[in-house]
Amino acid sequence: MNRRLPATLRELSECFRSKSLDPLTFTEHTLHRASDRAKHLNAFVRISSQTALQQAEASTQRHRSGSTLGPLDGATIAVKDNFCTRNVATTCASRMLESFVPTYSATVWERLERGGAVLVGKTNMDQFGMGSGTVDSIFGPTRNCWSESLEGERFRIAGGSSGGSAVAVASGVCFAALGSDTGGSTRNPASYCGVVGLKPTYGLLSRHGLIPLVNSMDVPGILTRTVKDCATVLNAIAGPDERDSTTVKKPFKPVELPESICLKGLRIGIPVEYHCEGLSEEVLHTWAKVADMLEDAGATVTSVSLPYTSASIFVYSILNQCEVSSNMSRYDGIEFGLRSDEDASTEQLYARSRAEGFNGVVKNRILTGNYFLLRKNYDKFFQKALQVRRLIAEDFDKAFTKVDFLLTPTTLSSAPLYEDFVQGTNRDQCAVQDFCTQPANMGGIPAISLPIRLSEHKLPISLQLMGPNFSEQNLLTVAKWIESQVEFEHLCATND
């Protein structure tokens, strides 16, 4: 395919409409592209060629007959490997689920599929979503496509735990990808890979078919190259789902982004607690520059305080590990998960199956969570963490009576080198990597990461915008304005 490739979903849809390109031809090219880059970047754990070609053929027929299903008909999309996809293996990048093939699809993928989307493949992740680098996977680490080198351990991490999805979009293989976000797992890799990453309001998107990590914080996330594409995907998958009691019952009103955006009267808050230890000068400079841009455009920019931010990472860690210990208990080798050959007794079968199926990170969180949930520790750890979580949510509620949105860093720096990243423990790295992102999960509020510029090492630097619950319409509108001003140049070429 020696032509200029579409850069956005709108361009792709226009190409299909004008018949200058058809979904089947485009999907064949995408699969070749995915396979070619898979060996270098390790973004995909499996490429679903047969499924994709069948879906693309059906889409091509619909386009020829003029009976398309919407703006995503024929669009190539990747799905993180913790979302169930019918008849396509779903492993959570763990040996525990290495042979699991779901008989049903997650609601969010089901809705994309009904809209004509094409499943390119399942993407790499940290095991069960427990990580911030996409380095703890049975399939090996994912390499950031912005890396100066892909040799040895000198590559840049992709972020996590949805690193494979972020790289699939950033490298130009897919137009969009599904990630999950428990404490920043969509926004963190979006920041490091220079793409848009949205964590919607808790309850706006169905969690049915998303293999749970922390039920009270997990949300499906969206990764795209543009804010408009993000809105298109959100419109396709948001809304009530009778199979998930935590989704809101009110019908979703689609996001419509205006062509002209005026910021006069808009109130932007800069949380002082996010100017924290470890924040790089480049990120700090970028943060200040975008705040100035917003002010110059007519917005009011003021400092605000979120007093419980410093406690948030500790509370998040406690609650995360408590829920992990509960959720992982289902994998016993009998009902779910890997079954060990050593079955002299039920106790031995349980022990060996879990020892062989889980990696050290998962085991550590299970043990720590069980410790916090012991009768003697329950009140002083779990109960107290729940109380402080409520105070964190109240911080946001109070702030949003004074400002409309909060502007913060997404990550404290650009993507670190893999060889440096793995020197720290998973727990220590998550404490650093999730500092700016996990408070939004604690409060259940929507947040979006936007690429702003490149660092001196030519790596993406991103910022985060947070808003009140169910403010996606206005949140994405402001995000689109910022995007239009910074004009971030994406890595993926549109010419092949």
UniProtKB/Swiss-Prot annotation:
It catalyses: L-glutamyl-tRNA(Gln) + L-glutamine + ATP + H2O = L-glutaminyl-tRNA(Gln) + L-glutamate + ADP + phosphate + H(+). Subunit of the heterotrimeric GatCAB amidotransferase (AdT) complex, composed of A, B and C subunits. GO terms for molecular function: ATP binding; glutaminyl-tRNA synthase (glutamine-hydrolyzing) activity. It comes from Culex quinquefasciatus. One of its GO terms (cellular component) is mitochondrion. The active site is at residues 80, 161, 185. Keywords: ATP-binding, Ligase, Mitochondrion, Nucleotide-binding, Protein biosynthesis. It is found in: Mitochondrion. The keyword Protein biosynthesis applies. Its main location: mitochondrion. Allows the formation of correctly charged Gln-tRNA(Gln) through the transamidation of misacylated Glu-tRNA(Gln) in the mitochondria. The reaction takes place in the presence of glutamine and ATP through an activated gamma-phospho-Glu-tRNA(Gln). Belongs to the amidase family. GatA subfamily. It is an enzyme of class 6 (ligase). SUPFAM superfamilies: Amidase signature (AS) enzymes. This is Glutamyl-tRNA(Gln) amidotransferase subunit A, mitochondrial. Its EC number is 6.3.5.7. GO terms for biological process: glutaminyl-tRNAGln biosynthesis via transamidation; mitochondrial translation. It comes from the Eukaryota.
